[in-house]
């Protein structure tokens, strides 16, 4: 099983929607704990399904490795990090928040997140210099950034680091977390997983800010 070189996080998949869920994978959530949605909903969305590669950065979020070599993420950690990220985002002016996704299945959820909260979004191919060069069309210097995949959005992380803007990232088991300030451990490749995570983030930020939120999770799901 491949391991990538570790990089410290700055803070103090394979088929993802057709993989059967083992009963004991719900054990990663503490019995009797209150999660943002039911554990069954997290499992059904495949949020816990990682890849067959892992990095040292992400090992602390891994619940177990399956017999087929697939790493399974800890759902309780995912739930907790969504809460932490939502609380952090609620302290920012939405117009100063930037959500980024080059990954196909992340673009619609990110767009809906932006629409629900009134944030900025950069979707699809990221134009180098968009955060650092005022001469670039669409230049924007945000106060905080959310990225869908540190690998696919690597240029965004590089530019954010150069200008000192904090980054929240959806990270799978194969991701490195250098230049990431807050990791949300999740399947960041699956259509349903991405829609659920972005929907929960938008819902929780709205709740914390006492603003209306009239969206269902299916509104965030990329159409087939």
UniProtKB/Swiss-Prot annotation:
User: Which InterPro entries has this protein been placed in?
Assistant: Ribosomal_uS2, Ribosomal_uS2_arc, Ribosomal_uS2_CS, Ribosomal_uS2_euk/arc, Ribosomal_uS2_flav_dom_sf
- Region feature (Disordered): 1-32
PROSITE patterns registered for this protein in UniProt: RIBOSOMAL_S2_1, RIBOSOMAL_S2_2
Q: Which SUPFAM superfamilies match?
A: Ribosomal protein S2
Q: Where is the composition biased (Basic and acidic residues)?
A: 1-14
Q: Report the record's Gene Ontology biological process terms.
A: translation
One GO term in the molecular function aspect is:
structural constituent of ribosome
Alphabetized, the UniProt keywords read: Ribonucleoprotein, Ribosomal protein
Q: Name one GO cellular component term.
A: small ribosomal subunit
Q: Does the keyword Cytoplasm apply?
A: no
Q: Which Pfam families match?
A: Ribosomal_S2
* Family the entry assigns: Belongs to the universal ribosomal protein uS2 family.
NCBIfam families, alphabetized: uS2_euk_arch
Q: Which HAMAP family match?
A: Ribosomal_uS2_A
Q: What is this protein called?
A: Small ribosomal subunit protein uS2
Q: What's the name of its gene?
A: rps2
